């Protein structure tokens, strides 16, 4: 059901002729029918942020969003004033259809960078999507399909609070995934009665511990957007801690689904760093290992090459992550193949057949801070997908 799982939301996904793939659903519309229209958002940190990101940041700033229109088939990034005007025109069209103001409508785009969208198709698609709006499971599924690019499957989540309020969500993302968000569009909905301020606080923490801790290829997108919308339709004001927990669980589920659908990936790699002096230190170490293309290629070949793990770990400056390299241990899928900075058990003992590969690094500093990041291996198929990618 995706974004329609929570009460008070309707959605649609239609083929608007934006994508180069004929007949593909490429435009989604999500409408918050209230009674509340509270909203929160986090966006890309890329300095070349796309026109729809620039627009949607302004929309979300006042904590109110009545609708989100999303398209695949074109990023509308690096398109200057003309691209921004397209985002405004799109918001104006949707606002007119639902009886709202343009600054109540967030706009999201994903696809090829550097080209304007076929605006006539976008606006006509918005009207078609409005006509198709429904609060059904099928409508939510259609919306989740419409935002896909190189994704091989839709990614959705549905969670229910202890007293019946709900969270639903959808995300797209498969490649161009790096820390500080990624090439992903995500809409999460809830029918809980919550304020925009509470939502923003919950989403910021949830994103930091989920979307900001995955990396498929280390490439940061211009278009990342994560929106959290509340309709209040359940009439239930949730416990604050439970609300924060479920938002975090929703983001964790969606981010893991991105890793599970990484472009061409044959292994999902979980990297956990423990025994660090701080969480930031552990995170820096985990990200350094996750960024190693040499390691990712080795994992693709079912080789738990611990030398590539520690060589990447060693690139983290000591002022960022102090540790003694002679005390570091590395386990892969439960086998300690690096002991005290040197060889441990033979790496042939590691079972590399599971889809998930767990790399556990203990810095043994005497402190107990830790962090986990996720990445994928690097395969021939990843190169093939991105060599041929157009939109």
What would you call each of these model-derived segments?
Residues 1-71, 75-85, 95-391:
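A structural signal for small-residue-enriched, beta-sheet-centric alpha/beta enzyme cores
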Residues 91:
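Generic structural marker for isolated residues within well-ordered, non-membrane alpha-helices
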